[in-house]
Amino acid sequence: MDVIAKTYANGFFKSFMDSTGGNTAVFLLLAGVVISVVIGYFLGSLNFALILSGKLYKDDIRKYGSKNAGMTNMMRTYGSKAAGLTILGDMLKAVVSVVIGSFIMGHIFGGYAAAFGCVIGHVFPAYYGFKGGKGVATAAAAILMLDWRAFLIVLGVFVLSVVLTRYISLGSVLGAAIFPLITFYSYHQIDQGRVYSGGWFAFMVALLIALLVIVKHHENISRLAHGKENKFSFKKSKK
């Protein structure tokens, strides 16, 4: 168990990096990060909203509602069962991605890289014409695996926003926006203000994930600004 925990924390490539050093170590670091991103991307491309709407309903969720292949549109179109299965699948692929990435290149470099790849895969899936969802559930599960304390704060912001406004999109945007701020603060505190490559890498990945989720909500943000955004409801619109 100690060996597994150590490999998860540092990554399989770490032992080779320690024994080589120099340019070879840098190459192994970059290779591990790239491999983690690629694995995360292809796992993330498994879009469960599209899989379930196709298998269970012989349909394409992107034809209905917001045209988004995600949990909220599945809820509005097919109901809570379909939405629950969607969020479970979209979160599970993020969990698997982070675990694999961590074993490859350690929790910081591998885990965060795989998480980023998974969110990109969900938003731009290779298997579905690069037209996927907005990455909220996938990003949430990735955050949980990367830093459970950050997840609790992000979840709190999301839930409070949705309870007060009933706008899923607003809660998603606010939750995404606060994630890189929490990540920056966490590693700044751990490192006591010193430049720490792993911490800065984690912050940059968190920032990219947040920006990706927020940009994918640009239409929702526009509707919110004009008071035209749909509020969340448990009622489905399609029989």
Give the label of every model feature segment.
Residues 1-29:
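Short, strongly hydrophobic alpha-helical membrane anchors
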Residues 30, 34-38, 84, 111-116, ...:
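Hydrophobic alpha-helical transmembrane segments
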Residues 31-56:
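N-terminal signal-anchor transmembrane alpha helix
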Residues 51-81, 222-239:
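Cytosolic, membrane-interface loops and tails of multi-pass inner-membrane proteins
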Residues 59-70, 127-140, 167-178:
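Short, non-helical or kinked segments that cap or interrupt transmembrane helices
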Residues 75-78, 101-104, 117, 121, ...:
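Interfacial segments of multi-pass membrane proteins
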Residues 76-101:
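Multi-pass membrane catalytic core of lipid/isoprenoid biosynthesis enzymes
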